Design a protein with these regions (language model features):
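Short active-site-adjacent structural elements
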Residues: 48, 71-73, 101-106, 126-130
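Short aromatic-enriched loop/helix-cap "lid" or pocket-rim segments at secondary-structure transitions
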Residues: 18-20, 106-107, 132
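C-terminal accessory "lid"/substrate-recognition subdomains
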Residues: 1-89, 149-155
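Acidic beta-strand-to-loop metal/phosphate-binding motif
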Residues: 90-98
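Short, conserved active-site loop motifs that form the nucleotide-linked donor/cofactor pocket
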Residues: 4, 91, 115-117
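Short, aromatic/basic amphipathic alpha-helical patches
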Residues: 53-54, 104-114, 136
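Short, flexible loop segments at boundaries between secondary-structure elements
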Residues: 10-12, 66-69, 113-145
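Hydrophobic alpha-helical segments
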Residues: 82, 86-89, 106, 110, ...
């Protein structure tokens, strides 16, 4: 017998890829129709992230790769070229937190892109209106603690 619990995923804020280098405000809402986002994804379904980015007024160009893509030097060169050809008062590269780990750890990541590269973390929100059982959070913590941990290896 299993219990069904409900949650949803939310993309939250913008975080700089390289903390010391980001010249722009970190809020999506600070982007305007004069700005452009180069959205780089290596996820199975980029549509929810695209929808979130469309909420701000900036124009969006998408570079989509397969799920769990291992970004190569050639991919980063394409990203740099595409970024160079973007129009906009401010141009930023946005990716998921998981893709950011894969991309930003590459030693061949272009230095010129570092100040303009951000990631959008994913947050899991428990739906209390559907999960009103007593002790739900305690049960959830126990279940999570029992799960084996997988670690991504840096590329």
């Amino acid at each position: 017998y299993q219990r069904m619990y409900y949650a949803r995923t939310l993309y939250v804020g913008l975080r700089p890829g390289f903390d010391d280098e980001a010249p722009y405000a970190r809020e999506r809402e600070s982007l305007t129709s004069a700005d452009t986002i180069l959205l780089v994804t290596g996820i199975a379904n980029p549509r929810p992230l695209i929808r979130v980015c469309r909420r701000c007024k900036a124009r969006i160009k998408v570079m989509h790769f397969d799920d769990h893509h291992d970004f190569s030097t050639a991919d980063l060169v394409k990203m740099e070229r595409k970024y160079a050809h973007l129009k906009g008062a401010r141009k930023v590269i946005v990716t998921t937190e998981k893709d950011a780990r894969r991309i930003l750890q590459k030693r061949f990541f272009p230095e010129a892109l570092k100040p303009y590269t951000f990631h959008m973390p994913l947050e899991i929100q428990i739906r209390p209106e559907y999960n009103a059982t007593p002790g739900f959070i305690a049960k959830l913590k126990v279940a999570i603690d029992k799960q084996p941990r997988k670690r991504e290896t840096p590329g």
